[in-house]
Amino acid sequence: MTELSIRPEEIRDALREYVDSFQATSGDREEVGRVVVTGDGIARVEGLPHTMTNELLEFSGGVLGLALNLEVGEIGCVILGDAEHIEEGQEVRRTGEILAVPVGDGFLGRVVDPLGRPIDGLGDIAAAGTRALELQAPSVVQRQPVKEPLQTGIKAIDAMTAIGRGQRQLIIGDRQTGKTTVAIDAIINQRDNWASGDPKKQVKCVYVAIGQKKTTIREVVNTLEEAGALAYTTIVAAPADQPAGFKYIAPYTGSAIGQYWMYNGQHSLVVFDDLSKQAEAYRAISLLLRRPPGREAYPGDVFYLHSRLLERCAKLSDELGGGSLTGLPIIETKANDISAYIPTNVISITDGQIFLESDLFNQGVRPAINVGTSVSRVGGSAQVKAMKSVAGRLRLDLAQYRELEAFSAFGSDLDKASRDQLARGARLVELLKQPQNKPFSVERQVVSIWAGTTGKLDDVPVEDIRRFEAEFLDFVGRTHGAIYDTIVNTGKLGDDLVSSLESAIAEFKEQFTLSSGKQLVNEAAPEALDPSAVEREEIAVHHRKPSDETAGH
């Protein structure tokens, strides 16, 4: 019988040959969970232990969800889409992707949803890339001071609460006080900069509509289109009928689109209309996810909700290209209460606020800006020198006017100086009124405010102020066009320019006709009569002689 012999070297060689020739087949690995509870735009999912915060999850049917709560054995998820067909027990898959949106110049002139998908029926958008919604804001060393003006075209704002590129300026007020109109005017006023073709002047705009009616959003689109401003504007729409998750992420989508241009050395402006509705949507989501409620039932991190959004607005350093992202958040108050929770939060985050009052609006003062409570913490740094020189007295004159107006309501007798102050204040208030969607260029603003603050309008009746202003500005453009050119080119208001303005307004007053039909400047004043030629009544004093009886006493 043959004896079986085992040779170890043969076994070793066979194993080595097998290992060398082995080719591993790549198998797809996928994490799958299932829906435990669903309802009210929220789903609780189990079985996905490696899910990341803000990761996108995919439900059956392609609906996406955003992972917000990462708990032991369970995930709280916000459904971004139609939740009707999501049921308990359905499979949920990880995508491995953090929430991001496409960005690029292709978004200009388009209307998109908070996920960056076009909803205007104009076809797909060619994106230049994607940008995560949750990115760190620029650090302190990556920024530089705000010093370039961003003109809104609104006299009251550009003169008293100036906005600079990279600033965050809050627009706050009750409903129906003109908050959206102020923001839309600021977008429309960038039209000339866009037409110049100069990237250093151009400002690309993003308008984020949160929780608004679709008809209102349609009106905004039409207004921008008619004004020629839609070509450089992107609209991110999260209407009132959308799930709370869309209203929550819409502002971050708008800022991500604007940040793309900022980091490419360009200038952008983003309007958040309005953050009150985003806070309410976040409160609803947090309560449904059973997060602990705080003041007014808002979650404890509602301040961080807005601070991490608005801190992205910045003026980048020259090393990073010098781009900027300017933010105009809008907050709606109730009964002019700016001391409520969300308003005070956003006021403390931003670089100033423009407070619109319903009382002023109802009085016909539009834009209804309350000069006393409105402020810009950037101030004169974001103004051209010409505007800074003429607007210095404007805020003081208006503040004194409001104080005297309240005092005179009691019927007290006022001295001549006070009456003059009231008269000039009334004319300044009339001068700052402005029609909707009719922004003023900076040179026309400078000339208009110069005329008001230097007393050149004191002899013009209040009811004729706006007509006088419009006709005078057109007159300067026709006959003294060099004045506008000098302001645009130098940004200063020198002595020679002031002399030209004084002669121009004197010349214009001679031909201006009041609404009463009279000339503003009379042809020739009658000569005063000599005092000797004036007939005067002489009073003779007669002294009565005392009688004898009186003398005896």
UniProtKB/Swiss-Prot annotation:
Where is this chain compositionally biased, Basic and acidic residues type?
A: 533-553
Which parts of this chain are annotated as the region Disordered? 527-553
This protein's major location comes to membrane
Q: Which UniProt keywords apply?
A: ATP synthesis, ATP-binding, Cell membrane, CF(1), Hydrogen ion transport, Ion transport, Membrane, Nucleotide-binding, Translocase, Transport
Q: Does the keyword Oxidoreductase apply?
A: no
Cellular component terms (Gene Ontology): plasma membrane; proton-transporting ATP synthase complex
The superkingdom of the source organism is: Bacteria
Return the EC number. 7.1.2.2
- The residues that the entry says bind ATP are 173-180
Q: Which CDD domains match?
A: ATP-synt_F1_alpha_C, ATP-synt_F1_alpha_N, F1-ATPase_alpha_CD
This protein's membrane topology, according to the annotation, is: Peripheral membrane protein
GO MF term list: ADP binding; ATP binding; proton-transporting ATP synthase activity, rotational mechanism
* Keyword Ion transport applies: yes
Q: Where in the cell is it found?
A: Cell membrane
Pfam families in alphabetical order: ATP-synt_ab (PF00006), ATP-synt_ab_C (PF00306), ATP-synt_ab_N (PF02874)
Spell out the residues of the site Required for activity.
Answer: 374
Family that this chain belongs to: Belongs to the ATPase alpha/beta chains family.
Its job = Produces ATP from ADP in the presence of a proton gradient across the membrane. The alpha chain is a regulatory subunit.
Q: What is the annotated quaternary arrangement, including any partners?
A: F-type ATPases have 2 components, CF(1) - the catalytic core - and CF(0) - the membrane proton channel. CF(1) has five subunits: alpha(3), beta(3), gamma(1), delta(1), epsilon(1). CF(0) has three main subunits: a(1), b(2) and c(9-12). The alpha and beta chains form an alternating ring which encloses part of the gamma chain. CF(1) is attached to CF(0) by a central stalk formed by the gamma and epsilon chains, while a peripheral stalk is formed by the delta and b chains.
> What protein name applies here?
ATP synthase subunit alpha
Source organism per entry reads Parafrankia sp. (strain EAN1pec)
